[in-house]
Every structure is written in structure tokens, then in C-alpha cells.
């Protein structure tokens, strides 16, 4: 997998994300692609849901919930860097206005815009087989006027 080919796949992924084409995003991923949104946690009464698992189960559910709660969700890609091993690093801002509850964050019509760092791996078949994302979850909560004390 050449660096330019891997970067092209990930660029298409973000284009589909911007278009809220969740099925299209998952179509760019292998059937067993790993998914890890490191800062993501939803605390419930009996368990904690974390953003770790597979794209087809955990990732797709998170992305679907996100675009539902933030109907104008968008991303601005600032840089995409890849290598011939299929590794691709993306710096992007994710932004949107909350209209529906997101986890335990009540909708107040607030907007957020937060820098994100993503690390992808694209396999030899041209499919994404790993997605990892990092961001400041507290920064998003502040922007959405959600102040939670543990």
C-alpha cells in the first residue's frame, strides 16, 4: 500500500463522514476493523461503555449517534500524512451544534469545535483495518455547557 493510496482512502473516509454517510464510512473498512476512541466513555448504572471494539459494532453506533445528535456535524481536515506501511495520521477539527442528547449531555443548542488526532491503518486491499481517535473530551463538554462532577 503506497502512502498516497492509503491517504486517498482516509481522505474519502472524511468526505463520507462530512456527508454523514455512515454506511459509506464502514464500507471503506475491513469486516473486522479495530476501533478505538480513547477518550470516549458513557457511564451507566451497571456498566461503563468505552469506545473500544470493532468499526462495524462500536464505531458505527458512535458515528450514527453523533450525526443524529449533531445534525450539522462537520470535519475540517488540516493534515493527512501517511507512509508505505499503510499508516495514516490525520489532524482534523470536528464541529457541530447539539440538537439531541448525546450520552448524558442534554441538548442546549450549544456548538463545539475541537481538534482531533486520528491514526488509521489501511491494509493491502485498500481497506481501513484500524481507526484510533484522540481529543479533549473535557473541552467538548465545556463547549456544550455540560459540567459533570464525578
Question: How would you describe each model-predicted region?
Answer:
Residues 1-150:
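C-terminal and inter-domain tail/linker signature
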Amino acid at each position: 500500500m503506497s502512502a498516497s493510496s492509503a491517504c486517498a482512502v482516509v481522505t474519502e473516509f472524511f468526505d463520507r463522514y462530512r456527508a454523514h454517510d455512515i454506511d459509506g464510512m464502514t464500507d471503506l473498512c475491513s469486516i473486522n476493523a479495530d476501533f478505538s476512541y480513547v477518550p470516549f466513555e458513557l457511564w451507566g448504572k451497571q456498566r461503563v461503555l468505552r469506545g473500544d471494539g470493532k468499526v462495524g459494532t462500536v464505531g458505527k453506533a458512535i458515528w450514527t449517534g453523533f450525526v443524529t445528535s449533531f445534525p450539522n456535524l462537520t470535519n475540517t481536515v488540516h493534515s493527512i500524512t501517511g507512509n508505505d506501511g499503510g499508516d495514516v495520521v490525520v489532524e482534523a477539527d470536528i464541529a457541530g451544534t447539539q440538537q439531541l442528547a448525546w450520552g448524558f449531555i442534554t441538548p442546549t443548542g450549544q456548538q463545539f469545535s475541537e481538534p482531533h488526532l486520528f491514526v488509521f491503518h489501511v491494509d493491502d486491499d485498500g481497506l481501513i483495518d484500524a481507526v484510533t481517535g484522540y481529543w479533549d473530551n473535557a473541552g467538548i463538554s465545556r463547549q456544550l455547557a455540560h459540567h459533570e462532577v464525578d
